[in-house]
Amino acid sequence: MIRLLGFIVGLAALSVNLSSQGRPVVVVNAFTVAAGVELPYDMELLQKQLVPELKVLLGKQFDVVAERPQAAQGTVYVLYGEISGWRAGNAAKRLIVGLGSGREASDIQYRITDASGTTVVDQKDTVRTNFYSQQAGSSGTLAHPIAQKIAERIRDARLK
């Protein structure tokens, strides 16, 4: 019985590994902060949060990693991002006005390049925190909405 269980677990691990071969890879670099923008968050922590967020949103089509694989089997895309503006949220305004006003917001500019360095997505967006995630920790409340926006743009670009 134990051997059978070990065999099944090994087979499952092998099938997961084989199914990920050939899928395009998205490498998520740490975002940078534009000159003059004071952002109270750690960009490396934001990167570590973006990777699993993008895995959830794009995991069926792409392998999402934080570092470029040494021997990639398929297409490799690289995500570069910059926070070009940031506005802190206003708790009093959220409490009094409601309806999502006073949320933390950030202006982001990001691009995705293919292996040859050709830009396949070049976008500038304003991202606001989700209404239900107002009290997040040290990388702020923007990781999830940034990942949602980037995943949406990748789907729109129909990368393969």
Give the predicted meaning of each segment.
Residues 69-120, 130-133:
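Surface-exposed short loop/turn segments
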Residues 60-72:
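Short, well-structured beta-strand/strand-turn elements
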Residues 4-59, 63, 122-127, 151-160:
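A structural "domain/chain start" motif
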Residues 34-42, 94, 130-138:
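Short coil/turn segments at secondary-structure junctions
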Residues 100-105, 113-159:
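Short secondary-structure boundary motifs at beta->alpha junctions and helix caps
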Residues 26-28, 54, 79, 110-112, ...:
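Hydrophobic beta-strand residues in large extracellular and virion-surface proteins
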